[in-house]
Amino acid sequence: MWGFIVALISGALMSIQGVFNTDVTKQTSLWVSTGWVQLSAFVVCVLAWLFTGRESVAALWQVDNKYTLLGGVIGAFITITVIQSMGALGPAKAAMLIVISQLAVAYVIELFGLFGVDKEPFEWRKILGLLIAISGIVIFKWQK
């Protein structure tokens, strides 16, 4: 149950963050806004680290799959693409397409066991669910 609650909070925060970041970008620039997002996130993480145990940062160099350390780089591109999509499509349409893309890519990762994730068997019902979600976007976008 806790996982569901955290996922719902995460989705809500992503939508709010996208709107905020898009507004900051309109008043500054894409790179200034993205840099601010990453810098402010870094400050929050450092403060949290200072107050919650101070685990060894050297543990990062012990990570088995070094490519997984690129999460922050990917995060910067996530920020940029969310800002651009929300600016072009509006928050609701952008969020729907973002979620569909997340769902499709996550399924492919599971299906092929990419990045060390446990491989899952192909299931038609998951494809059907994805198609229903895409249909929802078409209905949501439908204009008279």
Question: Predicted regions span which residues?
Answer:
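Membrane-interface interhelical linkers
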Residues: 1-9, 26, 31, 42-67, ...
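Glycine-/small-residue-enriched transmembrane alpha-helix faces in small-molecule transporters
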Residues: 1-27, 77, 81, 135
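Hydrophobic/aromatic residues within the transmembrane alpha-helices of Major Facilitator Superfamily
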Residues: 8, 12, 16, 43, ...
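Structural motif at transmembrane-helix junctions in multi-pass transporters
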Residues: 26-30, 81-100
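Hydrophobic/aromatic positions within or immediately flanking transmembrane alpha-helices
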Residues: 34-35, 95-96, 123-126
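Alpha-helical transmembrane segments of compact multi-pass small-molecule transporters, enriched
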Residues: 40-44, 97-112, 131
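Alpha-helical transmembrane-segment detector that highlights a single hydrophobic TM helix
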Residues: 63-76, 84
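Final/C-terminal transmembrane alpha-helix of multipass membrane proteins
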Residues: 129-139
